[in-house]
Amino acid sequence: MINNAIARRYAKALVQLGSEKDLIDRFSQELKVVSGVFAGNAELRAAFGNPAFTADQKKQIMRDLIARMQCSELVANFLLLLVDKNRVVCLPEIVETYEKLADEQSGVIRPMITTAFALDDSQVNAIKGALEQKTGKKVVPQVKVDQSLIGGVVTQIGDIAYDSSVKTQLARIHDILQKG
């Protein structure tokens, strides 16, 4: 819970800065790359959690990473601030929260569209268009296949699910027949 509050505070500040400078998308890309490097490198994560490394050593490690990733000055300063405040371990949560806040700021939703079979581009675009019309927001869909649905589509937008799968319809019929 504490990490969520911390992540939200840092992410909110960075979204505000990105919005002022019209750099929300660039910040997002840079943060994803840096977070991906941390996620894929256990030694790097361990170094920032290890008290044997001094603050200066941790800053130098971060500077080297920033240089290799060619981060913008603002993201570089943000990452160095995380080192100063000993919050690098919160980076995954900060990036996740940043993405959510940036999407809210930009009027973007990222629904999860689950189908029993793979969709072609025209089908995805049709669903995307319907969702954009319904929500009034830009839709960036994520599509996955779950053959257990048998047929139909389940669309998850945040906490709301639109379930028109055959699996759910069969379950409802089963419940009705059971109740008699």
Swiss-Prot record:
Cellular component annotations (GO), alphabetically ordered: plasma membrane; proton-transporting ATP synthase complex
Main location, first listed in the record: membrane
Gene3D superfamilies recorded: N-terminal domain of the delta subunit of the F1F0-ATP synthase
GO molecular function: proton-transporting ATP synthase activity, rotational mechanism
Keywords, ordered alphabetically: ATP synthesis, Cell inner membrane, Cell membrane, CF(1), Hydrogen ion transport, Ion transport, Membrane, Transport
Pfam families given in the database record: OSCP
Membrane topology term: Peripheral membrane protein
NCBIfam families to which the protein is assigned, alphabetical: ATP_synt_delta, PRK05758.2-2, PRK05758.2-4
Subunit-level organization: F-type ATPases have 2 components, F(1) - the catalytic core - and F(0) - the membrane proton channel. F(1) has five subunits: alpha(3), beta(3), gamma(1), delta(1), epsilon(1). F(0) has three main subunits: a(1), b(2) and c(10-14). The alpha and beta chains form an alternating ring which encloses part of the gamma chain. F(1) is attached to F(0) by a central stalk formed by the gamma and epsilon chains, while a peripheral stalk is formed by the delta and b chains.
Xref: PANTHER family: ATP SYNTHASE DELTA CHAIN (PTHR11910)
Function: F(1)F(0) ATP synthase produces ATP from ADP in the presence of a proton or sodium gradient. F-type ATPases consist of two structural domains, F(1) containing the extramembraneous catalytic core and F(0) containing the membrane proton channel, linked together by a central stalk and a peripheral stalk. During catalysis, ATP synthesis in the catalytic domain of F(1) is coupled via a rotary mechanism of the central stalk subunits to proton translocation. This protein is part of the stalk that links CF(0) to CF(1). It either transmits conformational changes from CF(0) to CF(1) or is implicated in proton conduction.
Protein name according to UniProt: ATP synthase subunit delta
